[in-house]
Amino acid sequence: MIKVDLQHSGLSIADLNEAKVKKVHEMIINKSGKGNDFLGWIEWPKTFDKKEYEEMKKVASSLRNKIDVLVTVGIGGSYLGIRAADEMIRGINHSDKVQVIYAGHTMSSTYVAQLSEYLKGKKFGICVISKSGTTTEPGIAFRALEKQLIEQVGVEASKELIVAVTDSSKGALKTLADNKGYPTFVIPDDIGGRFSVLTPVGIFPLLVAGVNTDNIFAGAIKAMDELVQGDLTNEAYKYAAARNALYNAGYKAEALVAYELQMQYTAEWWKQLFGESEGKDNKGLYPTSMIFSTDLHSLGQWVQEGARNVLFETVIKVKEPVANMLVEADTDNYDGLNYLSGKSFHEINSTAIEGVIDAHVNTGKMPNIVLEFDKMNDVQFGYLVYFFEIAVAMSGYLLEVNPFDQPGVEVYKYNMFKLLGKPGVK
């Protein structure tokens, strides 16, 4: 369901260090590398708790019938994967019953105040997601939203409208939820935040949204079954090895390029996955993203003629659109675009992909890796999640870093807590 095309990358199979790929594969399978206690995601699509899943379906169905808006409260891996899935699968301007909106991913007072105003008089529920319950952004957002919901519907009714996804037995959020009677679902101990979208972190909100999560798991299982080879016939490993080869050739940044607006947050999720997994020990590609053709009208000039040997592109090419439209002829043809009449928007978009790759690669000397996707749907989303997760494990180990920790984020947190006067921080 994802094919890696390297014909525009400037790389040959000989450049991809297959011998090292095979060694790293053994590390992953045997769980002998750094961070091996966070490899629970590898078997998760087949081994997740089916009893908990059925309970999630029941609670989600009940909540869905009571609300028009679900506010998910979380940040990082407790935010990006949910939004990536919802927008890729349901689209941006959908008309489904339940709207999903987000809080706890920013400390902007303006955003929180406007969100509060928007929710006044609306039937809304809350899914708060945090392993510890002490993360600043979701913590303060949940305080405000919980208070507002209780004021709107009362304490007893709120117990059926608030769900927590958190630790199985400990932590501030687990304690709060148990004390107040909110249902809880479990964030596994052996799966890090950026790998958690297929756990209750992502699955519960998506169930409330009405997404077919069985199909998401089916896609992930298909990826598990297909991406088993320990060599470069494994498409995920081929992608990881190619980006590693370009890094070793001196490239500093990788831009994930999508031509579909509803994949914007898939790219945001990908940035966290690769940025937190690889950006350590003064190593790692800087992950960025662009949405074409939109960003061709802003960043296209830099990509075409800016500094060379800094950036390469990884282009997502979707073969089948979710929906399609034809360009109609106009009698006056004021814009001179009648030559496109009868063509579909997707055909024009696909042609743009080919033209842009040709311009960036052959004229601009910008390496391109192309990832060919079948379509944008629930099965494909499950597949791409597993594809990128196994790819980043390989890529991180090729880089000889621990792909499963993120020690660098503690520095800014310490400084912020010190300035805010958090007890115990000096």
Swiss-Prot record:
Active site: 276, 297, 413
Pathways per UniProt: Carbohydrate biosynthesis; gluconeogenesis; Carbohydrate degradation; glycolysis; D-glyceraldehyde 3-phosphate and glycerone phosphate from D-glucose: step 2/4
Protein's GO biological process: gluconeogenesis; glucose 6-phosphate metabolic process; glycolytic process
GO molecular function: carbohydrate derivative binding; glucose-6-phosphate isomerase activity; monosaccharide binding
Catalytic activity: alpha-D-glucose 6-phosphate = beta-D-fructose 6-phosphate
CDD domains (alphabetical): SIS_PGI_1, SIS_PGI_2
CC terms in the record's Gene Ontology section: cytosol
Swiss-Prot/TrEMBL keywords: Cytoplasm, Gluconeogenesis, Glycolysis, Isomerase
Main location: cytoplasm
E.C. number: 5.3.1.9
SUPFAM superfamilies per the UniProt record, alphabetical: SIS domain
Matching Pfam families: PGI
Record's subcellular location: Cytoplasm
Enzyme class: isomerase
Coiled-coil stretches: none
Family affiliation: Belongs to the GPI family.
Function: Catalyzes the reversible isomerization of glucose-6-phosphate to fructose-6-phosphate.
Name used for this protein in its record: Glucose-6-phosphate isomerase
Organism of derivation: Mesoplasma florum (strain ATCC 33453 / NBRC 100688 / NCTC 11704 / L1) (Acholeplasma florum)
